[in-house]
Curated annotation (Swiss-Prot):
GO terms for biological process, alphabetical: cell division; cell wall organization; peptidoglycan biosynthetic process; regulation of cell shape
Family, per entry: Belongs to the MurCDEF family.
Protein name, UniProt field: UDP-N-acetylmuramoylalanine--D-glutamate ligase
GO molecular function: ATP binding; UDP-N-acetylmuramoylalanine-D-glutamate ligase activity
Gene name linked to the record: murD
Main EC class the enzyme belongs to: ligase
Classification of source organism: Bacteria, Pseudomonadati, Bacteroidota, Bacteroidia, Bacteroidales
């Protein structure tokens, strides 16, 4: 049985899990990787190349439950039987980010929130690179932090963090923590209790020191209340659409300029010059600018980066104009609030493609925008009953689709010249697609084939 005892067992063999295994091995730890599903060929080849033992299609309890510590991939819920058994045996369970943080003294800039995480992460990464910093991109984007710490270390990292990653972080410290917003999402993973999900997001301030910064959206009532009731140790640098208090660090003034104050020299920029439009992107730009200013990046570099950034794929990505109709891919909108921001930014009549795997959604939040802007709804999913129950009778044209080909064909028939066909599903993608990227890629392919 001794041969089955490992220092580290990694559950999940995606980028996060394989990166953790590589770092564990590099640090001289005896590591084993277990994936209940199929391991992608590129990761299997990598594990073989580094002679890291692994299994797929099962979780062997005799091995896993003898580990000194388990590194859990964020996609594995706490309700998984193997996790419950590990907890019962009091085996420590951490995230890949937590594990990687033990082996680096790099400056960590961490971004979380229900919406805007990827855009802000990429925008800030772009800004720091433009300023000449040697910076790594990690978390939900780029290569895993563990892989980079092992084989491509940087003095700075910009890290996108989900609530699932924050759940299993205990000693990790964010030098700059950014919380963009908190709206109901992934409630199926949090016993359908918003407060549990919100508490996970607030963990980003854990272990911060007085010299660190906490950047947050001051207009969010939950965040503001939480900050008042549980004052973080770090310096507070809030942003808002208007200057709410003397402490407000960034806002949009009456001249429609983005203003950053209270950080060495003031920063002012016409919001029309921002690379991305829409209210949500003003928030993302303010958070980016505050973080850059807090890191002593020069105004010129910040201004350039805010102006020439290219948005991430699958986030309000314009695919094509076909016979006077614009087709926009917002497949990354996996919750209702993301779809709200997408609809808010639309300047034309909309044919909206909604649906997928519901995560405890409340469609009341987008009802007014749908009623005022949407001329047709297409429900793309295996089970559209909840969508029909909410929207039937409110929008005259509603259709169901069980494939992206069918959804785009229906949208093409519904749309009139000057309209926008918007894929902004407000749901996860796992009923019909591998992930939101696959969903967006299929949308792009179907549109370009029209």
């Amino acid at each position: 049985m001794d041969r089955l005892k490992y220092d580290i067992v990694v559950l999940g063999a995606g980028e996060s899990g394989v990166g953790a295994a590589l770092l564990a091995q590099a640090k001289g730890l005896h590591v084993f990787v277990s994936d209940y599903g199929k391991i992608a060929p590129k990761y299997k080849e990598e594990l073989n190349r580094y002679a890291i033992p692994y299994e797929e299609g099962r979780h062997t309890e005799a091995i896993i439950l003898e580990a000194k510590e388990i590194i859990k991939s964020p996609g594995i819920p706490d309700t998984a039987p193997i996790i419950r058994q590990a907890v019962a045996k009091e085996i420590g369970i951490v995230s890949e980010i937590e594990f990687a943080g033990r082996y680096t003294d790099a400056f960590m800039v961490c971004i979380t929130g229900s919406n805007g995480k990827t855009t802000t992460t990429m925008w800030l990464y772009h800004t720091l690179c433009k300023a000449g910093l040697d910076v790594g991109l990690a978390g939900n984007v780029g290569f895993s932090l563990a892989r980079q710490v092992a084989y491509d270390p940087h003095p700075y990292y910009v890290i996108e963090l989900s609530s699932f990653q924050l759940d299993n972080m205990y000693d990790f410290r964010a030098n700059v923590a950014i919380l963009l917003n908190i709206t109901p999402d992934h409630l199926d993973r949090y016993d359908h209790r918003f407060e549990l999900y919100a508490e996970a997001k607030m963990r980003i301030t854990r272990n911060q020191q007085p010299e660190d910064c906490f950047i947050y959206w001051e207009d969010d009532p939950f965040i503001s209340r939480w900050v008042a009731e549980h004052p973080p140790v770090a310096r507070l640098l809030p942003f808002a659409m208007e200057a709410r208090t003397d402490n407000t660090t960034a806002w949009i003034n009456e001249k429609n300029e983005l203003v950053v104050m209270n950080l060495n020299s003031p920063f002012v920029m016409d919001e029309e010059l921002l690379a991305l439009s829409g209210m949500h992107n003003r928030h993302n730009a303010m958070a980016t600018a505050i973080a850059a200013k807090a890191m002593d990046i020069k105004n010129e570099a910040i201004r350039e980066a805010l102006q020439d950034f290219k948005n991430v794929p699958h986030r309000l990505e314009k695919i094509a104009r076909v016979k006077g109709v614009d087709y926009i891919n917002d497949s990354k909108a996996t919750n209702v609030n993301s779809t709200w921001y997408a609809l808010e930014s639309m300047k034309t009549r909309v044919i909206l493609i909604l649906g997928g795997t519901d995560k405890g959604n409340d469609y009341t939040d987008i009802e007014n925008l749908v009623l005022s802007k949407v001329d047709g709804l297409i429900f793309l999913g295996i089970d559209n009953e909840k969508l029909h129950k909410f929207f039937d009778g409110k929008i005259s044209r509603i259709a169901d689709a069980c494939s992206m080909h069918e959804a785009v064909s229906l949208a093409y028939k519904m749309a009139s010249k000057g309209d926008t066909v918007l894929l902004s599903p407000a749901c996860a993608s796992f009923d019909l697609f591998q992930n939101y990227e696959d969903r967006g890629d299929q949308f792009r392919k179907e549109v370009l084939n029209l």
